[in-house]
Regions:
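Beta-propeller folds
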Residues: 8-14, 19-357, 364-366, 373
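Conserved hydrophobic/aromatic "anchor" residues
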Residues: 41, 50, 89, 403, ...
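Cap/lid segment of the alpha/beta-hydrolase catalytic domain
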Residues: 390-505, 512-513, 546-552
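Generic beta-strand/beta-sheet core signal
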Residues: 219, 237, 312, 360-362, ...
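Flexible loop/turn segments at secondary-structure boundaries
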Residues: 204-205, 272-273, 296-298, 317-319, ...
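Bacterial N-terminal signal peptides that target proteins for export
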Residues: 1-6
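Active-site-proximal cap/loop segments of hydrolase catalytic domains
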Residues: 463-649
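Beta-propeller and related beta-repeat scaffolds in trafficking/envelope systems
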Residues: 135, 242, 251-255, 376, ...
Length: 649
């Protein structure tokens, strides 16, 4: 029997590249998308599903017998533009899948998503969202999401569902009919019987249940007319009541614990997000569950089809999970020791009785593998590596470090050095993250690993303006506070030189999204420092970024976030193209709904007009993630050639 039946053909084709080190083979190995994008386990524990990457941008949903490991495909998405986002078991015979993508709407690019149910044989595909009609008075952009998997009612789900009103074409009664906004429905996936649970509200943003089918929390998005303000109001219900009451105190509810009749809430504690348990019995009693004096608590961990909360997470030098459940805590520790090459354990889901656990085991440098653990037999079974082309490769270790900024503040970062080298006098890459209110976590990064495999030292700074470190670190964000953020990124390059890691004549900067913005702006701020610049899907003009939001409901939020005044000019790489002296290579998808391709079009034109060496590679039909093996392989090949000609390797 093949060891990994989920992708036998891919294994035969791709493992031949694992032992070689030419640019083309490195680009193919690291540019290939995750072989297994996601997995789930059925309530009985007898079946597994996997969303597997196919050729190019395609994805395939496969069903696997947990005992025999026999797998067969049931549906495929083309990625042009629809891609499978996720699939889960609603019962042992019924699945729910989300698919989505981006499409041109007039002069804008807008995202869309749809929910469907289907049998485990791939047949009887049915839409779960509101059916689209010619009389719709708005764009049917998102179907909604599954709110509760109703483990006590197999084959039914609770869905928060988006509704668009229709024009009354009969000429009788009101000119407009139907619901508008976000509501909650119970749906029987076999009969497709829909039972309304919460009437749609135009300003509703989301709901939370107790995992038992009871809607306990409603989040309202405040708006002025149709323009969102970015503020929210939270309401709750007491157990057994239908009356909405104002939620006591501030914070962001993450989950409802039915067992304790409480909500788990993120709220500020000394300028950092902490986790609280807030009673929903009318008392408003609030108890601190967890806080960290350096970083934010960022989420809760759920397990099982009832989505029971079993712990919480935060990231200091790596992502950490703290479990409430002592059995799960002990199990995670034991399993981490049982798989020493993958000490980090993330539980994905469990069978209804909890006897079988689906999990992902990984390390700082390796994306890892999916495993199935049977608590009854104590048997641990490897199901599938996340990235087949890398299973025979020596990957680079990721080291958490810190370095001083120009003002003496210590900046956390990650350093990835080429495996097997001396770590001295290397060509080096500064790789700022996107966001900007995101952060690097020191886990597997295919772009950083590719660069290390090509012989480059790579530093990934969590500059001021990054998320996860509290309000003071976030400050004005990486756009309004660009001088500080870019200064911290510059200090990362100078740190590598000061430690003898980097050859000062062979420094480059590479970034994606905000990271691409930071790469270009850094090259304008420090024209003598970098010898090459790579910007992937970059923001290049802050005023253009604001104007692109004009047709969307979050326009005021975007404009407030980016800011205004002279600094938006000085902080726009497009306006400073003449100051950039290093050659620039840009990549952008023309269906990018996050950062319009116009940013790169204008940037390359401005650079060429200034007499600079610049090139833009446009990818047709791809969005911000460039989630296509062929495109990513081409991009890495071009990056490797470009860097080799600029700073060597």
């Amino acid at each position: 029997m093949l060891r990994y039946p989920l992708f036998a053909a891919l294994l035969l084709v791709q493992t031949t590249a694992c032992l070689s080190a030419t640019l083309e083979e490195d680009a193919k190995a690291f540019g290939t998308r995750e072989t297994v994008q996601s997995m789930d386990i059925s309530p009985s524990g007898k079946l597994l599903l996997a969303v597997v990457s196919g050729a190019g941008r395609t994805s395939v949903l496969k069903i696997m017998d947990a005992a025999t490991k026999e797998a067969h495909p049931i549906i495929m998405s083309s990625g042009d533009p629809e891609s499978i986002d996720w699939c889960r078991f609603a019962s042992d015979t019924q699945l729910v899948c989300s698919y989505g993508g981006y499409a041109k709407v007039d002069n804008d690019v807008a995202g869309f998503s749809r929910l469907v149910t289907l049998g485990i044989d791939g047949k009887n595909v049915k839409q779960l969202g509101q059916p689209e009609r010619a009389s719709d008075l708005g764009i049917h952009q998102f179907d909604g999401d599954i709110l509760d998997w109703l483990p006590d009612q197999p084959g039914s789900v609770l869905m928060q569902r988006n509704y668009v009103q229709q024009a009354n074409v009969t000429g009788i009664g009101d000119a407009v009919e139907g619901q508008e906004g976000l509501g909650v429905d119970r749906i029987d996936l076999s009969s497709m019987k829909v039972t309304p649970v919460e009437a749609a509200q135009k300003d509703a943003d989301s709901y939370l249940t107790d995992g038992r089918g009871n809607v306990r929390i409603e989040v309202i998005a405040r708006a002025i007319g149709d323009a969102l303000t970015g503020d929210y109001k939270v309401k709750y219900r007491r157990a057994g009541s239908k009356k909405w009451e104002d939620f006591p105190g501030g914070g962001t509810p993450l989950a409802v614990e039915g067992s304790s009749d409480s909500a788990l809430v993120l709220a500020s504690n000394g300028g950092r997000d902490a986790l609280y348990r807030v009673k929903l019995d009318g008392s408003g009693a609030r108890t601190l569950v967890a806080a960290n004096d350096k970083v934010d608590i960022d989420d809760v961990v759920r397990l099982g089809h009832g989505q029971r909360v079993i712990g919480y997470t935060y990231v200091d030098d790596r992502r950490r999970t703290v479990y409430f459940d002592n059995e799960i805590k002990g199990l995670a520790a034991a399993l981490g020791k049982a798989i020493p090459q993958f000490p980090e354990i993330a539980f994905v889901n469990a069978s209804a009785d909890g006897s079988k656990l689906l999990m992902l085991a990984y390390s700082d440098s390796d994306p890892g593998s999916f495993y199935l653990f049977d608590k009854t037999t104590k048997h641990l079974d490897e199901l599938a590596p996340v990235r087949v082309p890398l299973i025979s490769r020596q990957l680079a270790s990721v080291q958490p470090i810190s370095y001083p900024a120009a003002d003496g503040v210590s900046i956390p970062a990650y350093l990835t050095l080429p495996p097997g080298g001396t770590g001295k006098d290397l060509p080096a890459i500064v790789l700022p993250h996107g966001g900007p209110e995101a952060r690097d976590e020191g886990t597997f990064d295919w772009l950083a690993q590719f660069l290390a495999a090509r012989g480059y030292a790579v530093i990934q700074p969590n500059f001021r303006g990054s998320g996860g470190f509290g309000d003071a670190w976030l400050a004005k964000n990486g756009y309004q506070g660009w001088r500080t953020s870019i200064g911290d990124i510059t200090a990362a390059a100078k740190y590598l030189v000061s430690k003898g890691i980097a050859d000062p004549k062979r420094l480059a900067i590479v970034g994606w999204s905000y990271g691409g913005y930071a790469a270009l702006l850094s090259a304008a701020e420090q024209p003598a420092l970098y010898k090459a610049v790579v910007a992937i899907a970059p923001v290049t003009d802050l005023n253009l970024l604001k104007s692109e939001s004009n047709d969307f409901t979050d326009s005021a939020i975007v404009k407030n976030f980016v800011g205004s005044g002279p600094d938006t000019i000085q902080g726009s790489p497009l306006r400073r193209a003449a100051e950039i002296k290093a050659p620039v290579l840009l990549f952008h998808g023309d269906l990018d709904g996050n950062v319009n391709v116009a940013h790169s079009d204008k940037m390359v034109a401005a650079l060429k007009s200034a007499g600079d060496q610049a090139e833009l590679v446009r990818f047709h039909g791809l969005d911000h993630q460039l989630d296509d093996t062929d495109a990513r392989t081409q991009m890495l090949t071009r990056i490797g050639t470009f860097l080799d000609s600029s700073i060597g390797h």
